[in-house]
Structures are given as structure tokens and as C-alpha cells.
């Protein structure tokens, strides 16, 4: 067997064992925070990452920061959009990974988030939506909030899954659709409810996945 053939087999095994995770960041005039977001993605303890940034036409220097890391970014664009959910949908349309995470430009991931999600995905597959705990950050004050397993009554009480912690198999988007752009602030809640009503199971991860500034 040639060296080239052995390398091809090794690459195939790696791709099979480590599913590609697509990550979408949407941004607009986020110069103060987006660099931390980007670093939390590209410095993950996991290498099979496709990183997509959809910027809404920032004018404050955000694009300069994106360009600083564009060798680590699979796709990015800066153009006007029709709101946050339109931007998220643009990112999803460019995603080719098995799983998609969405993180806004003022939030950031824990360094082991992707490895944790990928490990569960390999065990559970495409019929689950993966989510975990979040850390709220207000200045120096930090609060961990959990998001345990859900039932339908939880949805009627309001949003009960923290969107920055959510990872959705691309197959789920194909089944239930993407975000409804008719919503201005509740599109993520609508999407999660559609998942639940379409028998997508929610897999809770008992650890902090992401951090959110409040």
C-alpha cells in the first residue's frame, strides 16, 4: 500500500469518526465583542469545524476583525439582511456539516463544547437536538443556568432552551424548516417548538456549552 493510499484511508476514518460541525455567527456592528466569539470557535478542542460568519453590513470595524481571521473562516459575507433570522437562515444555507450551531457575535463557546456535542451526536444521531447549560455574564457577575429535559408544558411557559447552546443536525432543518423571518425576536422559540411537535428529541447536556452577555 502506498503512503498516499494510507493517508486517504486515514482521512476517511477521521471524517467518519469526527463529524463536521458547522458554526454560524451573525453580526452587526460588534467590534467590541466579535473577536472573543471568533476565538472561541477557532480555538476549540475539536478540529472538524466549518465556520460561517454572516455580517449585516457593519460600519464600525467589525469587518476588519473578520478579515483578520479569514484564513480560519470557511465563508463570510457582509451585506444588508432582513433581520437576525434572515441572517441565520443565510448561514444555514451555506452549512455543509452534520450539525449546525449558531452563536451570536456577543456570545462565546466553552472550549470543549464541540467535542462534547460531537461525541453525543455519534451516539444518538440525527433525530436529536442537542443543548446544554449557559453562563450569563453581567460585568464580573456570572450565573450558571441549567436547561434540563423538557415537556410540552415547558414551552407554554416560554423559551426554555438557551439558543447559544443549541446544536441542530442539518437533517432536522431539512425536516422542520429553518427560522420563520416573520418573527423579530421569537423565531428561535418558534423553531424549537416546531422541533418538539415534529418528534425531534431534545438531548440535554449537563455542562456549560456557551456564555452570554446580558
Where do the protein language model's features map onto the residues?
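Nucleotide-sugar donor-binding/catalytic module of glycosyltransferases
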Residues: 4, 8-214
Amino acid at each position: 500500500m502506498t503512503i498516499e493510499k494510507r493517508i486517504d484511508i486515514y482521512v476517511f476514518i477521521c471524517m467518519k469518526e469526527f463529524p463536521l460541525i458547522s458554526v454560524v455567527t451573525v453580526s452587526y456592528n460588534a467590534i467590541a465583542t466579535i473577536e472573543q466569539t471568533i476565538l472561541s470557535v477557532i480555538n476549540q478542542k475539536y478540529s472538524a469545524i466549518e465556520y460561517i460568519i454572516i455580517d449585516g453590513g457593519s460600519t464600525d470595524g467589525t469587518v476588519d476583525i473578520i478579515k483578520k481571521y479569514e484564513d480560519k473562516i470557511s465563508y463570510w459575507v457582509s451585506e444588508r439582511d432582513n433581520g437576525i433570522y434572515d441572517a441565520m437562515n443565510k448561514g444555514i444555507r451555506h452549512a455543509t456539516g452534520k450539525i449546525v450551531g449558531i452563536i451570536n457575535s456577543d456570545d462565546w463557546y466553552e472550549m470543549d463544547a464541540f467535542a462534547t456535542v460531537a461525541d453525543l451526536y455519534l451516539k444518538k444521531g440525527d433525530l436529536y437536538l442537542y443543548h446544554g447549560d449557559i453562563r450569563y455574564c453581567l460585568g464580573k457577575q456570572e450565573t450558571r443556568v441549567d436547561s434540563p429535559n423538557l415537556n410540552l408544558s415547558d414551552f407554554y411557559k416560554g423559551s426554555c432552551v438557551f439558543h447559544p447552546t443549541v446544536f441542530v443536525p442539518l437533517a432536522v432543518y431539512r425536516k422542520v424548516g429553518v427560522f420563520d423571518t416573520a418573527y423579530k425576536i421569537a423565531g428561535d422559540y418558534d423553531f424549537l417548538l416546531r422541533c418538539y411537535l415534529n418528534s425531534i428529541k431534545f438531548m440535554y447536556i449537563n455542562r456549560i456549552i456557551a456564555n452570554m452577555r446580558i
